[in-house]
């Protein structure tokens, strides 16, 4: 491209250096997409507080039905479009989103995904550190800080290696939490039939499950483009998502809810350090003498989601800022994450899920609308900034985070459930109404 030609459109540096992943480097869905996504849902962070505010409000069948719906929504609304765009273009999220937000406007969703995955890195590191200290039967703050530092930097180093290394590790480690969940479920099985929810608000239980699952998955869903670029065809995209996302949500989520229900049905109370008896740690302590080993194995299995989050975050910042070496940006991000862990800021899981779902759901909604308008094809980056995408994102984010916006009537907040799903739909509709003109494609 002639830099002296004033008629040539501005092309950001991260687009100039973007190179598609060739077909020869791609692999079947069962070698990358499915095992890595399944590892994310097998992470104890997913179901640690899944029963809080859900199982306590409604019966078990309603909660399991909500998991089925949540799994299908995560696949169809959040994962499918980015993954298909990644497969078609061979490019990661930060490139494919420029069709929706523009070449100059792609910085926002790129940095947003990177920042939120950095937050997830901190959240997962906090959980791993906490479980290791629980396994050691220690509440020492010094030990907690030392473990957080060692875990955080070690996982960041692994994250630099890339998704192929993470996928290889996932093949083995994904079996560990699955076995642990089944052991915990078996240990609490006798109390399941005795469980009775303390409240009868089935809609609150149903929407609560949707919000937690979607909020947990939104960042990984947008990162579907990064997985799609490693898929050979649409069949890999579909099967990898249905097995690794939809099925994993139902199987893992149901087992965790049943284990907690069994523990409470048998009379278990909240263990030390737990916010309520509906945390999954209640069910783990009910295992008995082996609970310490179970905590250690759950922590070891968190290697997969920790490295996944750091990989996506590092990929984001290195793509947006190609002049900064990837190892440097990764270690800076790891330092920020470790600080959040040591200060216990990363311990508020449900609050973090609400922010993730509210801010990334409209990004996925706008991208899905653009995908439909473009004939379900990747047409390349738009020149400049596509304001239709930004307007859809702003309005959708407002809807998605209405619950934490001050001055909003409580009746509005009560009606805004499931907020993350509503924010997706609002952004999707707003973008369709804006109907931006056919993309002015930047020629490479």
Which sequence ranges carry the predicted segments?
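C-terminal membrane-solvent junction of multi-pass transporters and transport-like membrane proteins
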Residues: 366-444
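Selective recognition of specific alpha-helical transmembrane segments in multi-pass small-molecule
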Residues: 38-43, 69-78, 113-122, 176-187, ...
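Juxtamembrane transmembrane-helix boundary signature
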Residues: 67-101, 108-116, 436-439
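Hydrophobic, membrane-embedded alpha-helices of multi-pass small-molecule transporters
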Residues: 27-47, 185-191, 198-261, 286-307, ...
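Membrane-water interface regions at transmembrane-helix termini and the short interhelical loops
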Residues: 51-55, 83-84, 127-138, 150-173, ...
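Membrane-interface loop-to-helix entry segments
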Residues: 146-188, 200-201, 241-245, 353-365, ...
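Membrane-interface "cap" regions at the ends of multi-pass membrane proteins
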Residues: 1-61, 74-75, 204-211, 229-239, ...
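Transmembrane alpha-helical segments of multi-pass small-molecule transport proteins
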Residues: 36-40, 67, 110-111, 137-160, ...
């Amino acid at each position: 491209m002639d830099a002296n030609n004033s008629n040539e459109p501005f092309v950001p540096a991260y687009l100039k250096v973007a190179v598609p992943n060739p077909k020869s480097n791609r692999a079947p869905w069962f070698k990358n997409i499915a095992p890595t996504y399944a590892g994310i849902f097998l992470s104890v962070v997913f179901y640690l507080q899944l029963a809080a505010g859900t199982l306590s409000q409604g019966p078990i069948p309603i909660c399991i039905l909500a998991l089925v719906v949540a799994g299908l929504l995560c696949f169809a609304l959040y994962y499918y479009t980015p993954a298909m765009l990644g497969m078609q273009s061979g490019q990661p999220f930060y490139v494919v989103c420029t069709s929706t937000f523009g070449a100059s406007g792609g910085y926002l969703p790129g940095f947003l995904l990177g920042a939120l995955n950095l937050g997830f890195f901190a959240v997962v590191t906090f959980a791993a550190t906490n479980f290791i200290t629980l396994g050691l039967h220690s509440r020492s703050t010094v030990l907690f800080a030392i473990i957080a530092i060692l875990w955080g930097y070690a996982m960041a180093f692994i994250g630099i290696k890339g998704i192929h290394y993470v996928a290889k590790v996932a093949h083995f480690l994904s079996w560990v939490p699955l076995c642990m969940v089944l052991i915990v479920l078996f240990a609490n099985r006798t109390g399941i039939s005795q469980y009775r929810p303390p409240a009868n608000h089935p809609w609150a239980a149903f929407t609560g499950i949707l919000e937690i699952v979607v909020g947990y998955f939104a960042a990984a869903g947008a990162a579907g483009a990064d997985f799609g670029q490693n898929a050979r065809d649409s069949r890999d995209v579909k099967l990898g998502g249905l097995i690794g996302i939809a099925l994993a949500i139902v199987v893992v989520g149901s087992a965790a809810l049943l284990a907690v229900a069994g523990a409470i049905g048998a009379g278990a109370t909240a263990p030390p350090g737990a916010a309520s008896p509906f945390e999954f740690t209640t069910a783990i302590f009910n295992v008995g003498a082996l609970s310490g080993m179970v905590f250690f194995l759950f922590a070891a299995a968190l290697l997969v989601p920790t490295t996944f989050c750091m990989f996506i975050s590092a990929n984001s910042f290195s793509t947006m800022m190609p002049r900064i070496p990837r190892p440097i940006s990764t270690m800076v991000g790891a330092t920020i994450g470790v600080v959040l862990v040591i200060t216990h800021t990363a311990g508020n899981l449900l609050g973090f899920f609400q922010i993730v779902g509210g801010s990334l759901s409209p990004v996925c909604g706008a991208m899905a609308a653009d995908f439909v308008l473009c004939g379900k094809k990747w047409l390349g980056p738009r020149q400049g900034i596509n304001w239709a995408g930004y307007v859809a994102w702003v309005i959708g984010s407002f809807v998605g985070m209405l619950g934490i916006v001050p001055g909003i009537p409580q009746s509005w907040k009560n009606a805004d459930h499931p907020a993350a799903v509503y924010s997706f739909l609002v952004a999707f509709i707003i973008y369709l109404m804006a109907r931006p003109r056919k993309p002015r494609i930047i020629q490479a």
